[in-house]
């Protein structure tokens, strides 16, 4: 009897260990993460649903930011020239595959953040254009097309990348071969991490990449995004990266100057004063102060989806003119 009780206790202990420490097996995102992330206290999300009512095919859009995120901004895409109009028109008509290519650094390479956006957009506009797949950190992020109408969302991230990383003939050819209708560019974290960062050089690097992409993909439209924020320094003396605010500003100014769309995630989640504090307060930032937990990346993916759908609904509500 005593031995049976002991065995039962051991089973319970082992079970609890594996429930609390799923990192004992597998990989999930860009760094060794569990296949099922550790359980965090659920984020308190606002319950209100934002829905636009008008003629045309509008998509229901839910708020994504936790209530306790401080000094946030409206989660919208800035696009004063309506440069994304051709992409949204194709989404609305859906006469064939509509292709998105999302390029960027390790935040994109981890697949969690862009994959959430992809799955939600597939739910909105149809997943018939791609074969069912299971994307993990060990797989690539490319979708496999069926030829049917629907959304196709390709993910191309490189750990440690800056926008310069993609200014090679090989990478430009790979992007162009996917025939994107929209390219999303998510860089800035690694630019900001360099102590030798210079804003004029950064602007030139963005311009070089976009010039190469425009030449290779003349019918494509572009969406720039700003980084989510990060810390720098050793763990005991870590501080909020002071260069991120400049990096985000350069990306915004470049987009404005060249009539391009920009999603300013950095400002949306709290900007200079609170972005990093908001991530940390909700246990969404990993111990390195740069990368995020799976739940943190899922929130970013939901935010990007929300911003895209808000912009899409606006175009539909105004007659796509």
Residues of each region from the PLM?
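Catalytic His-Asp segment of secreted/periplasmic serine-dependent ester chemistry enzymes
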Residues: 27, 227-321
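Conserved catalytic region of serine esterases and O-acyltransferases that act on ester linkages
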Residues: 30-80, 136, 140-141, 282-321
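Alpha-helical scaffolding within the catalytic cores
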Residues: 78-91, 140, 164-176, 204-212, ...
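Bacterial Sec-dependent N-terminal signal peptides
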Residues: 1-38, 321
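Conserved, well-ordered alpha-helix/loop/beta-strand core segments that scaffold catalytic motifs
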Residues: 184-188, 206-210, 214, 221-226, ...
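Extracytoplasmic/secreted cell-surface and envelope-processing proteins
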Residues: 36, 110-112, 192-199, 231-236, ...
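Solvent-exposed, polar/charged alpha-helical surfaces in well-ordered, non-transmembrane soluble domains
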Residues: 111, 115-119, 173, 200, ...
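Conserved SGNH/GDSL esterase-like catalytic core that processes O-acyl groups on lipids
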Residues: 99-102, 107-204, 208
């Amino acid at each position: 009897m005593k031995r049976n009780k002991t065995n039962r206790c051991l089973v319970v202990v082992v079970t609890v260990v594996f429930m609390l420490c799923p990192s004992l097996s597998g990989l999930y995102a860009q760094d060794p993460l569990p296949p099922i992330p550790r359980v965090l206290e659920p984020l308190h999300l606002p319950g209100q649903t934002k829905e636009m009512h008008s003629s045309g095919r509008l998509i229901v859009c839910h708020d994504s930011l936790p209530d306790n995120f401080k000094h946030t901004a409206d989660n919208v895409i800035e696009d004063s020239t309506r440069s994304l109009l051709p992409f949204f028109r194709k989404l609305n008509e859906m006469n064939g595959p509509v292709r998105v290519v999302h390029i960027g650094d390790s935040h994109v390479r981890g697949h969690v953040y862009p994959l959430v956006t992809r799955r939600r957009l597939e739910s909105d506009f149809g997943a018939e254009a791609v074969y069912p797949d299971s994307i993990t950190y060990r797989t690539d992020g490319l979708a496999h097309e069926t030829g049917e109408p629907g959304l196709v969302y390709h993910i191309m991230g490189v750990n440690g990348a800056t926008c310069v990383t993609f200014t090679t003939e090989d990478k430009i050819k790979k992007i162009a071969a996917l025939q994107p209708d929209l390219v999303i560019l998510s860089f800035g974290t690694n630019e900001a991490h360099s102590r030798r960062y210079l804003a004029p050089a950064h602007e030139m690097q963005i311009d070089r990449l976009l010039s190469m992409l425009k030449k290779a993909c003349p019918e494509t439209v572009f969406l720039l995004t700003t980084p989510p924020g990060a810390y720098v320094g050793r763990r005991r003396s870590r501080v909020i990266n002071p260069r991120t605010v400049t990096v985000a500003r350069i990306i915004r100014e470049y987009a404005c100057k060249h009539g391009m769309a920009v999603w300013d995630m950095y400002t949306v989640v709290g900007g200079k004063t609170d972005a990093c504090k908001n991530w940390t307060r909700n246990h969404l930032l990993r111990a390195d102060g740069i990368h995020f937990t799976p739940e943190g990346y899922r929130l970013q993916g939901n935010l990007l989806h929300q911003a895209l759908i808000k912009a899409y609904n606006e175009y539909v509500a105004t007659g796509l003119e």
